[in-house]
């Protein structure tokens, strides 16, 4: 950009000792004047060495700000990310999680480049893996979405799988969000104009933010080159365990307070959701997708895709059956 504008990195964290150093190092190595950005960390009452790590970095970085959230949660109105965004002074807000590691020194400049177009309201990063990663980690980072069941709803995953469906301007894809079929983003390195959160009345959750942006038909860029590494669970078992816990919390209570409903009120949306479940269990559609990616990229880790989609879908179905009343309320409302 011709004029470097103020940027606020916002991290909502709790017990982040495993990856926090790598996350902060990725931010601090950017080819961007340190006086032109701030790092706001909102801690949710960490009980490990997270706070001592933050203190260590604050001794050498005056642009690092620590806030506290006694309610512990990072997402939701009045929670860590929302508090950090409200305190942000930058014209642009970068949302990162503590296990997001920026790859390359020019990531921030490349992510800001699309904002030369005044109609672009957010810039979503693609993901990549690092040398020595397991095939599972390579797959998750290349697909760009933690939950493969949500692939049809993920902006990053759709760009990866179907790039020809998106228009390219200069060095980024451009997508106008559509309330009839929201492709969501917002996690793993997403940059927003600060005014977005003013227009949608604050931050709640990544998916809800994009749903609110879609109501206003906002445009999102996906730059071709910059990448973030999501240092997530190292194996399939731990990952399935984590996703199961998240989904259990969702169907038990969280669905009641989310703006975005995966199963919208229209009959066509409910039918599309059922077809998605059936196709996920049949394996064939996701197998075709994985084979296409193997032939296109030569990366054999794509062969994990149909099996992971099947197992995660089966896990969600089992959890839903044990909470059938809540699921029916969610599906039929």
Question: What are the functions of these language-model segments?
Answer:
Residues 1-29:
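N-proximal low-complexity "stem/linker" segments adjacent to membrane-targeting elements
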Residues 106-155:
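Conserved donor NDP-sugar-binding/catalytic core segment of glycosyltransferases
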Residues 93:
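Short aromatic/hydrophobic "clamp" motif used to bind/position activated sugar donors
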